[in-house]
Amino acid sequence: MKVRASVKKLCRNCKIVKRNGVVRVICSAEPKHKQRQG
C-alpha cells in the first residue's frame, strides 16, 4: 500500500474507489498498485 498525495491508475486493471471519504486504488492484477490518498 502506497500513501500518496495524488493517486493514479497505474494499469488498466486499477480501479479508483472512495471508502469512508478516503480515495483508494485497488488492483486485481497487481497488488503492488494498491494506493491510498493522504
From Swiss-Prot:
| A GO CC term attached to the entry | ribonucleoprotein complex
Keyword check for GTP-binding, yes or no.
no
Give this protein's Gene Ontology molecular function annotations: structural constituent of ribosome
SUPFAM superfamilies in UniProt: Ribosomal protein L36 (SSF57840)
Could you tell me the keywords of this UniProt record? Answer: Ribonucleoprotein, Ribosomal protein
Q: Name one GO biological process term.
A: translation
Note the InterPro entries from the entry.
Ribosomal_bL36, Ribosomal_bL36_sp
Task: Provide the transmembrane region boundaries.
Answer: none
Family per similarity comment: Belongs to the bacterial ribosomal protein bL36 family.
| Protein known as | Large ribosomal subunit protein bL36A
**Chain's gene name:** rpmJ1
